[in-house]
A protein has these predicted regions:
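Short, charged recognition helix plus adjacent turn
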Residues: 1-13, 97-125
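A short, Lys/Arg-rich alpha-helix, primarily the initiator
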Residues: 18-52, 129-143
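Key DNA-contact positions within bacterial/archaeal DNA-binding proteins
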Residues: 54, 65, 94
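Recognition helix of helix-turn-helix/homeodomain-like DNA-binding domains
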Residues: 61-77, 102-104
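Short, basic-rich loop-to-helix N-cap that marks the start of a DNA-contacting helix
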Residues: 74-87
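Long, compositionally biased
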Residues: 88-89, 113-142
C-alpha cells in the first residue's frame, strides 16, 4: 500500500485556499496517522522491510524472543532498545524521533550530551556497535 509522505501532503496543503478543498483534503484516507503503535510504524518502514527480522535482531543485538515480543506489542521497549532497533535499521533522525514518540519514550534532546552523540551516530548511519564506541569515546553510557 502506498502511503503519502508528509512532504507530499504539505505540498498539496500549501495550495488549498477554500474550506471545501480543506474538507476534501481531510477526508482523503492518507491524511490520518495510521500508526498508533511503535511495532506497526517500525515494521512499515522500507529499510526495516528490506533487512528483515533476522538481520535486525543480529544488528541490534537484541534477544530474538524480546524482539518478537516488542513487535507483537506484548512488551514495551525502553528508550535504548528502540534506539538500538533504529540504528540497526539505519533510520533517519526523523524516523527515529517518530519511533521514540510512538514507543512512549522521550525524543533525543539537543541539550543532552549523550543524545547529541546518538544524534550524530544516527546522522552518520552508524550501527549499534559504532554508536556505542562513540558514546564510550566521550565518556557516556553505551546503549543498554
Amino acid at each position: 500500500m502506498y502511503e503519502s509522505t508528509t512532504t507530499q501532503l504539505e505540498n498539496i496543503l500549501a495550495n488549498i485556499s477554500s474550506e471545501k478543498q480543506m474538507e476534501e483534503f481531510m477526508e482523503h484516507p492518507k491524511v490520518t496517522d495510521s500508526f498508533h503503535s511503535f511495532p506497526k510504524y517500525f515494521e512499515s518502514l522500507e529499510s526495516v522491510q528490506t533487512l528483515g527480522s533476522g538481520e535486525l535482531i543480529k544488528r541490534s543485538s537484541l534477544e530474538r524472543s524480546y524482539y518478537y515480543q516488542i513487535m507483537k506489542g506484548t512488551r514495551s521497549p525502553g528508550r535504548d532498545k528502540v534506539l538500538r532497533l533504529c540504528l540497526a535499521a539505519g533510520l533517519t533522525l526523523r524516523e527515529t524521533t517518530r519511533a521514540l514518540e510512538l514507543s512512549g519514550n522521550a525524543p533525543l534532546y539537543p541539550k543532552n550530551r549523550r543524545d547529541i552523540i546518538l544524534t550524530v551516530a544516527i546522522n552518520q548511519k552508524a550501527g549499534v556497535i559504532d554508536a556505542n564506541l562513540l558514546l564510550s569515546k566521550y565518556g557516556e553510557e553505551p546503549l543498554a
